[in-house]
Amino acid sequence: SLKGMISVGPWGGSGGNYWSFKANHAITEIVIHVKDNIKSISFKDASGDISGTFGGKDPRENEKGDEKKIKIHWPTEYLKSISGSYGDYNGVLVIRSLSFITNLTTYGPFGSTSGGESFSIPIADSVVVGFHGRAGYYLDALGIFVQPVPHGTISFGPWGGPAGDDAFNFKVGSWIKDIIIYADAAINSIAFKDANGHCYGKFGGQDPNDIGVEKKVEIDGNLEHLKSISGTYGNYKGFEVVTSLSFITNVTKHGPFGIASGTSFSIPIEGSLVTGFHGKSGYYLDSIGIYVKPRDVEGSISIGPWGGSGGDPWSYTANEGINQIIIYAGSNIKSVAFKDTSGLDSATFGGVNPKDTGEKNTVSINWPSEYLTSISGTYGQYKFKDVFTTITSLSFTTNLATYGPFGKASATSFSIPIHNNMVVGFHGRAGDYLDAIGIFVKPDTAV
C-alpha cells in the first residue's frame, strides 16, 4: 500500500478480542496500566489523537494496576521497536512485561520479567506507526506496524542556465549546518558543511578575476532546519547563471545573497527538510536545485496552494493510489473530486454555485503502473455577478502522460519542477468554485 506499513507480531495469547491502532502522525505518548502483567495500553499521536484503551476490563479494584506514562519527544525521538515477555497470569496467556525502544533510548521493562517467553525484534531503520493485538481483561497479545525510516528524497529544480562544466550532486546523512556563499552581482560559488563536519564544494568560483564577497549562513539543527530555497537566474557577463539566492528555514529567510535579476524561482513547500543540493558550476554557479525529504514520519510534503484566498480550506489524503479525478470546468475550474483504489471517494471541492456548474471531465489513472506526479495550471479573475480569483485551468501529470488543460488558461501560471515523487493528496480552498489548489507528495521510493 501507499502507506508502506509492515505488520510485525503479535506475541502473546489468543484470548480477548482483536484490536488495531494506526497513528495519523508520530506516536508521542504511551500509557500502560501494569502490575504483575500488562493490564491495558493506550496511545496518543502528535496531532493529539488518542487511541482508546485496549484491555483493562477486569472489574476488580486490585487488578487495575499502576499507571505508567511514556512520553516520546518527537520529532528528534521516535519509536523504533518493542520487546517484552508473555506467560500465564490467572490461568490466561497474556503479556507479562514490555519495553519500548526509540532511536535514543529504551523505556522499561514494565511488568514482571520472571518466567514466560521473551520476544524482541531484530529490526533497523524502522518507525513504529501503530500497534495491534488482542485484549479483554488484560493485554493478551501485542504487535506493531512499522514503516521504513524514509530515506527517500525528492528532487526540486535545478533552476538556472544550461552551462557549467562541473555537475555537483550530494545528500547529507545529518543536516546542512553551514552554507558559504561568494557573491557580488551574481552567485560566484557555493559550499556546504553538514553536522558531521563533512564539506561539499566549493562549486563555481573559477573566474580568478571575479570571486565575490564571502557570506556565511549557520543553521542550528536543534532549533532550525533548512526547508527550501528561492532566488533568481539571468545573464551575467554573457552567461546564464544564478544571480541571487535565499535559504529558507523554519525560523527565517537567510538572504538574498547576490543581486536579484532575471527570472525568479521559489517553491512553496512545507513539512520538508533539505538534505542535499544538485546543479552545475564553472566560472560561476550556473544552476542549483535541492533534495528534500519529509520532515515528519508519515512522510508527505505539502506544496502550494496556488490561487485565491476565497472559499474555505479543504484537504484530501488518499488511502491508496489516486486513480480518478473528476473536474467540472468552463471558463474556470468549478470543482474537483478524487477517488482512490480502495474505492474511497473524496468530497467535491467547489461547485457550490448551482447556476454555474460547468462540464464534467474525468481523468482515469491506471494505478499502480501509472501514478500522479504533479499538477500545473493558471489562476486569475473570474466574473459571475461578482469577481472571484479562482483556479482557471488545471493539468494533471503522471509518470506516463499529462491530462488537460481543463478550463481556460489565464495570466498567472504555476507549475512544479519536481521529480522522484508521487502525489498522495490535495489541499486548497473552495466554495462556489475551486479557489486554490496544492498537492501532498511523497518520495516514490515509498510506494
Swiss-Prot record:
CDD domains, per the entry: Jacalin (cd09612)
Region (3 X approximate tandem repeats): 1-447
Domain Jacalin-type lectin positions: 5-148, 153-294, 300-443
PTMs per UniProt: The N-terminus is blocked.
Homology family: Belongs to the jacalin lectin family.
Subunit composition and interactions: Homodimer.
Task of the protein: Mannose/glucose specific lectin. Shows agglutinating activity against rabbit erythrocytes.
Record protein name field: Mannose/glucose-specific lectin
Organism of origin: Parkia platycephala
